[in-house]
Amino acid sequence: MDNYFGTDGMRGKVGVEPITADFFLKLGWAVGSVLAKRAKASVIIGKDTRVSGYLFESALEAGFLSAGVDVGLLGPMPTPAVAYLTQTYNASAGVVISASHNNFQDNGVKFFSAKGLKLSSQYQSEIEKKLAETMISVGADKIGKAYRYEQPLGRYIEFCKSTFDRTQSLLGLNIVIDCANGATYHIAQSVFSELGANINIINNTPDGFNINEHCGATDTKYLQQVVLESKADLGIAFDGDGDRLIMIDENGELVDGDELVFIIAKAWQSQGRLVNNTVVGTKMSNLGMHHALRDLDIKFIEADVGDRFVMEKMQKSGSILGGEGSGHIICLNKTTSGDGIISALQVLEVLVKSQSSLAKLKQSMEKYPQILINVKTQARINLKNYTKLQRTQLAVEQTLGDESRVLIRVSGTEPLIRVMVEAKDKIIAQQGAEKLSNIFK
C-alpha cells in the first residue's frame, strides 16, 4: 500500500502523481467513502490562489459526490479558515487544496476532521486502504449534492477579530502586511483595519502564478524594505495558505516563529493565562528559546517537526501554545490549527497592552545562530545509507562543543534533506552545516 500522506497532507508537482486530476477524483471518492461509513456526510472545500486549484477542486468535488457526500465550495480561503468553518458549518470534514509556502507549480491537499483538527494517522490509514480499491460510484439516487457558500469570508473575519481583546485597539499602529499573493489577500486588510490599524498591504493581487513568488513568510526582503522606507511600526508576512506568520520589527529585523511564541508565552504567563505553564516546540526550535523559557520556569516540550505533531503534543500535555520557527503558531485557546492572522493578533495584543515595540518585546530571548541548508534530492532517501554521515556528524559536534546542536532530517513535504546546525559561534555553525550538506551533493 502506498503512503501518500506526508507531515502536512499531500504535496507535489502538478501533473506528477499523485498531484493529478485522476488521483484527486479517486481521493475524493476514497475520503468520502470513509466518511460515509459513519453517517450522512458533507464536506467543505477551500483552496489557495494557485491556478491549478480550480482543476483539483472540480476533481475532488466529483469524487466526493460519487461517494454520496454533499460538497460545499468556499472558494479561495486560508487553511485555518477552513478548519474553523468546518466546525461552524457542521461539516463532516474540511478540505484545503494548497501547497502552502511552495510556488505555483506545486499543489496539494490537507484534511480537517469535523472538530477542525488535522486527520489522525488512523484516519489517514483508512483512506489509503480505500485508495487501493477500485472506485465504484454510489447509485444515482444517492449521489451527493454540491453548493457554494455565499458569505464564508464574513464569518471568518468576525471570528478572527473576536480573538483580540476588544477592550484594546490597534488605533495608531502603522502596519505593512504581505499576503504572499495567497489566500489571505481578501481577508487580512479587513481584520486589522477594522480593529483600528493603518494598513499598507502588499502582494495582495494573486493571478494564479505569483503565489509565494519572492514574497510572503518565506521571502521577507521586500517587506523589510517597505517597513523601513515607510517608517511603519511593524510588518506582518503570511504564506500562501495563511497558516504561517513571520513579523518584521520597526528596525526592519525579522522576528521568527520561535520568537513570536516566546513573546506570547511570556505575556500569557504573567497574566496567569498560560495553561499548565507549558509550551510545545519542535526539534528545530532555537536553543535560545529553550533557555529563555527555562529562565521563566516555563516547561518546554519537544515534538517532531510539523504542526500536526506539535498539535498532538499540545493535546497530550494540555498546553494551549505551541509552534515552529517557520511560523506555524497554534493558540489552542483561540483556534484549532496554526493561524497566521490570529497569531499576529495575539502578538499585537501583547504589544498594545505593554505599550512596547516588537523590537523590545523580542529582546528577552537571545537567539542562537542557526544555519539551515536544504539539499535537493531526486526522491525520498534513507539517511542510514550514507555511511560517511555518522562520522562527519560526530566530528562536527566535537568541533561545535557544548551549547550546540546538529539536526539532519528528510523533509516530510518536499524532496529535500534539511541540515541544521546551531551554535553560539555563527561562523563555526556555517562551516559545520556546509561540511554535512556536502555529503548529499
Swiss-Prot record:
Keywords: Isomerase, Magnesium, Metal-binding, Phosphoprotein. The modification Phosphoserine is found at residue 100. It catalyses: alpha-D-glucosamine 1-phosphate = D-glucosamine 6-phosphate. GO terms for cellular component: cytosol. The active site is at 100 (phosphoserine intermediate). It comes from Ruthia magnifica subsp. Calyptogena magnifica. InterPro entries: A-D-PHexomutase_a/b/a-I, A-D-PHexomutase_a/b/a-I/II/III, A-D-PHexomutase_a/b/a-II, A-D-PHexomutase_a/b/a-III, A-D-PHexomutase_C, A-D-PHexomutase_C_sf, Alpha-D-phosphohexomutase_SF, GlmM_bact. GO terms for molecular function: magnesium ion binding; phosphoglucosamine mutase activity; phosphomannomutase activity. Mg(2+) binds at residues 100, 239, 241, 243. Its cofactor is Mg(2+). The keyword Membrane does not apply. This is Phosphoglucosamine mutase. The keyword Isomerase applies. Pfam families: PGM_PMM_I, PGM_PMM_II, PGM_PMM_III, PGM_PMM_IV. Catalyzes the conversion of glucosamine-6-phosphate to glucosamine-1-phosphate. Belongs to the phosphohexose mutase family.
